[in-house]
Amino acid sequence: MEGSDNGDVEYDEYAEYRDYGVSDGCRRVLLQWVVLPSWFVLGALVVSFALVRAYDVSIPPEYRYLPFLVSIVVFGLPHGAVDHLVPARLRDESPDLRSVSYVMFVYTVFVVVYAGVWFVAPAFAFAFFIALTLYHWGQGDLHASLALLRTGVDSRAGRAATLLARGSLPMLAPLVFFPSEYREVAEAVISVTDVFGSSGVSAVAFAFEPTFRLAVAVFLAVACVATVYFSRSSFEAGELLLLGVYFASVPPILAIGFYFCFWHSTRHIARLLALDPVASERIESGDASGAFFRFV
């Protein structure tokens, strides 16, 4: 709500996006315990791999996959374990059997259908996975930008640009800078379910051509520039720069593993905690550990 010059009260259609109900006290604690550590970890990895390249150090593949596997167990399962409670929380209601059953039904139908698509059209399923993850990660970072960094992206175009930039950097930047590794993962995943001997692997070959990768690079640049333009925020520009350098310099699997552990999952969990009135009060009072244990 905003006051007009004539004393009337005008409706502010973007007010709900400015803080997402995160109080200043809760925000300060989450910045300290969630945002700042993510900057430190990703920044440290950028510096570390600059040194790795400078001294020509080789990292065994198993060590590159380890953070990714750990992230799935330690953060992946917990960060999605309360998804069935989210719709009710978003409506400021207590979860009940009906709301939980509805979410579980929708999830089950989606999983069954999607699993079938993997066997019939694995290349399409892989592309859909990339697109869905891009949206999910971008939407999560959009919330963090608005609620924690207070970037003030009010327009729909600005929010769309932020979502695309934030989601595309982890999903598409490795394709631009590490095409061989990206292709290796894509072909390995697609071939697992390509039981009918379809041309699943060859169907994605175009994505690794220089022309397509150049188009992706241009898309990333435009999305990032548009995000900074709409936000006018140094925090937004700084985080985009950090993410861009990070995914351009750290090997993809290792980069995704640490990003998921220390960036996406922690911000997603922080978002869910902020939606819980009891957890939010504990965070604001400085009891961040109590809020987290309420989550787990």
List where the protein language model places each region.
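Short, hydrophobic transmembrane alpha-helix segments
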Residues: 49-63
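Membrane-interface helix-loop-helix junctions at boundaries between adjacent transmembrane segments
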Residues: 112-176, 187, 194
